[in-house]
């Protein structure tokens, strides 16, 4: 009994609150009465923006609405011109930018031309010009011989014969090389590889000659065995022993 009485008192309090709220809402100028379930069915707070008495809920919606929506007719509008103006409705952006660029292009200046790079040969960085040669299996620094000016009118066969003859003459006339030393300790800042028989080489060379004699390319003894001749000229032995290597230092 007491519980039912309390429920009735609670309902009456809610009804009184709803009626008082409806009266306060009805006094506002934007209050609209309920026009049916079509509006009251959308009583969600996120969709129902009109201030009206909702017959579905039993009280006024103005409690849950913060601001009424402005009527579309009252919104500020831009007057539409009656006659079309000279300006087109659309514009080609690429053409417009191109025209603007052509107008202001004379203001631009070309960047300064960079200086041309200066090249130099690596050989110019060294005081002396050396090449590496293998003499009796030893790698030694040898001063590069100066290039000789050759006649322009010469057949290839005669040219090759002249070069071979010149190499043989230089090897015969050149001094004998006593040992392999560094370029800094020699008199001409390099070892003169165009020496004599080259049978007198480095002191530590005897053991290496024995090891290199097995391949038949590095030692003079192997060359003598291959040629089957009793006597070999010094110039020929020098040409066979010295091997030019393309590496430059």
Curated annotation (Swiss-Prot):
<dbReference type="Pfam" id="PF15823">
    <property type="entry name" value="UPF0524"/>
</dbReference>
<feature type="region of interest" description="Disordered">
    <location>
        <begin position="174"/>
        <end position="230"/>
    </location>
</feature>
<keyword id="KW-0524">Neurogenesis</keyword>
<dbReference type="GO" id="GO:0048512">
    <property type="term" value="P:circadian behavior"/>
</dbReference>
<comment type="function">
    <text>Plays a role in neuronal and neurobehavioral development. Required for normal expression of the postmitotic and mature neuron markers elavl3 and eno2 and neurobehaviors related to circadian rhythm and altered light-dark conditions.</text>
</comment>
<dbReference type="GO" id="GO:0007399">
    <property type="term" value="P:nervous system development"/>
</dbReference>
<dbReference type="InterPro" id="IPR029670">
    <property type="entry name" value="UPF0524_fam"/>
</dbReference>
<comment type="similarity">
    <text>Belongs to the UPF0524 family.</text>
</comment>
<feature type="compositionally biased region" description="Acidic residues">
    <location>
        <begin position="201"/>
        <end position="213"/>
    </location>
</feature>
<protein>
    <recommendedName>
        <fullName>UPF0524 protein C3orf70 homolog B</fullName>
    </recommendedName>
</protein>
């Amino acid at each position: 009994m007491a519980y039912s009485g309390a429920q009735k008192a609670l309902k009456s309090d809610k009804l009184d609150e709803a009626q008082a709220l409806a009266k306060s809402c009805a006094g506002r100028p934007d209050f609209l009465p309920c026009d049916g379930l079509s509006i009251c069915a959308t009583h969600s707070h996120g969709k129902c923006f009109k201030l009206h008495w909702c017959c579905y809920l039993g009280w006024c919606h103005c409690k849950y609405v913060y601001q009424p929506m402005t009527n579309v007719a009252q919104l500020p509008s831009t007057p539409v011109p009656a006659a079309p103006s000279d300006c087109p409705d659309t514009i080609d952006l690429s053409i417009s930018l191109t025209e603007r660029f052509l107008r202001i292009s004379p203001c631009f200046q070309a960047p300064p031309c960079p200086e041309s790079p200066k090249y130099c040969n690596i050989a110019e960085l060294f005081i002396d010009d050396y090449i590496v040669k293998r003499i009796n299996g030893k790698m030694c620094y040898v001063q590069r011989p100066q290039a000789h000016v050759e006649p322009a009118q010469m057949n290839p066969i005669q040219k090759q014969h002249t070069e071979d003859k010149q190499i043989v003459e230089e090897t015969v006339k050149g001094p004998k090389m006593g040992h392999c030393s560094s370029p800094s300790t020699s008199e001409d800042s390099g070892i003169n590889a165009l020496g004599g028989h080259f049978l007198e080489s480095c002191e530590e060379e005897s053991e290496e000659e024995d090891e290199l004699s097995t391949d038949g390319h590095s030692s003079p003894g192997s060359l003598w065995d291959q040629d089957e001749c009793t006597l070999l000229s010094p110039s020929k032995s020098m040409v066979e022993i010295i091997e030019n290597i393309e590496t430059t230092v």
